[in-house]
Amino acid sequence: MNQLLYSKLNSLIKVEPSIATSIGKIQLDKPVMLASGILGISLDVFNRLYRSGAGAVVTKSLSTEPWEGYPNPTIFSVKGGGWINAVGLSNPGAPNFAKMIEPNQNVPIVVSLVGSIPEDFEMMIKQFKNCKVLAYELNLSCPHVAKVGLEVGDDPELVTKIVTAVKNTTAVPAIAKVGLGASNYLNTVSTAIDSGIDAITAINTVRATAIDVETQRPILSNKFGGLSGTPIKPIALRCVYEISSKYNVPIIGCGGISTWEDAVEFFLAGASAIQLGSAIGDNWIGVFDEINKGIVQYMKRKGFSTIKEMVGLAKKS
């Protein structure tokens, strides 16, 4: 059924568009997810986010053992919009976190994992054997912690070993979260796909810094952090467009998304779902429902019945 005909029928019978979406094997009732790094800390919070319209929640990146992270200051509000953070991947460790979410039966949880070697990921996944996990997101792109994140993602051989180990350890879908590092990020995408990854999240924060002109020193204790929010949206959108143009892989768009218009742009560029984080700092958790409703109204106006009909349309113009 073409779009014009559907639009006319829709106006007559008032069919509500569906915002359910699939990211390969991963099924979501709603396309807007919580990104890793913000609020992904407790089951109570996860339940509240889910009730507020999040299609899934991604946990903070978890390590094999608890990490304290960096001392304050760890976050800086950028003039004109956005944030630079260098929290240092503070987290309670995968074993402790698994015990905390074990009672969950309702919330679609994506567990974010960070490590240096394949054995790290194998060990962490085994901790969740009694948990309801929608997917694992492999953090191959944190820009401000040594020996993990981007340092792993920039090493094709290590990416191959990690993705292979994960796929051999669990039948739960695995997502590679990529970012802009020293090498071409598309090499990370290609390597992950060749190794059997189920989907790609693009992108992580972008390495950045800020300096206090009075003290004449970097503001963050770690000197460098990751830039998130509105300033990186065009970069993230470009990456999603490039990945979807070059590879046949499900994509989750992430980076600077705060409105339904942003979400639709990412769908049109090739993403099947989106994640947001910094927008919560500005709009709190009502942003999920607000974006979902905006997407539905757009779909009604344009005659779309499903998210899938929008995915990648910008590449056909």
Which residues make up each language-model segment?
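Hydrophobic faces of well-ordered beta-strands that scaffold small-molecule active sites
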Residues: V32-S36, V57-T59, I109-L113, Y136-L138, ...
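Glycine-rich phosphate-binding active-site loops on the catalytic face of alpha/beta enzymes
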Residues: T59-T64, L140-C142, A199-T209, G256-I257, ...
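C-terminal helical cap(s) of enzyme catalytic domains, especially alpha/beta-barrels
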Residues: G69-G80, I211-G225, A279-F304
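Glycine/Thr-rich beta-alpha phosphate-binding loop at enzyme active sites
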Residues: G82-A86, P143-E157, T188-S245, V249
